[in-house]
Amino acid sequence: MKKIFILFFLTLFLSSCSSIKRVGEDDLLLKQNTIVVDEKKNTNSDLNELLVQKPNIKTLGLPLSLYFYNLGDKNKPNTVNEWGIKKPKTYNFIKNIFSEKQSISYANSMIGLNNWFLKNGQAPVIIKDEKITKTISNLTAYHKNNGYFRVKAQSSIEVQKNKKAIVNYTIDKGRPTFLDSIITNIKSSVLDSLYQSQKSLSFLKKGDQFKEANFIKEASRITNLYRNNGIYHFTENDLGYYNIDSAITNSYKTNVDL
């Protein structure tokens, strides 16, 4: 009996091993993403994390989770009554040979198995234009936050056979922007004195490439500096911060007002 069950399960599993089984007629299954930065294949793992859509998870080179999902069917009945209506011959056969209790038990088992496949499997990742647009926005914001204010990001869909496609992202970073003068305007002499005493520890230094992360670190550093010296109610919101030149000139430098 055990061998028969295993054979039955394998037959079902192999019959589901079409990755496009649940892909609509006008849909495309995401096979792969590619990212090219300045005409070179991307090696920055941070960019991969910005992809809104990623292909179905693979195990041993196969999208097993997708295959499991394909064994299920969202349109199958979810109650014994629905199951009996859609599968009257099977329901009545078991009822007549054994009992209605066995028919109900069998129906519940089939419903539970179907739901298990849907819950533990992974639905096919269908390419969506709005998610590609969101990815482009993510990639653009990432580079601007790292000083590439003139970055250009584009996408293209490479359609392949069997309802599959590759989404290609192309990024032209442009030249980075560097920090020029760091200007402070601290009206309180006490606060100014504290700031100047540890200015050498600043995360913002002339000549460094603009990085949003360094501004966040600097805001935290100044806040902790003041709080550790008795200015307990000082917050990052009290900083007149991020007064960065809005018009980046051809020199690719920007002043920072603090």
Task: Label each region the model flagged.
Residues I6-F8:
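Sec-dependent N-terminal signal peptides
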Residues S18-L258:
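Interaction-mediating elements
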Residues M1-I4:
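Positively charged n-region of N-terminal signal peptides that target proteins for export
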Residues F13-S16:
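C-terminal motif of bacterial Sec signal peptides marking the signal peptidase cleavage site
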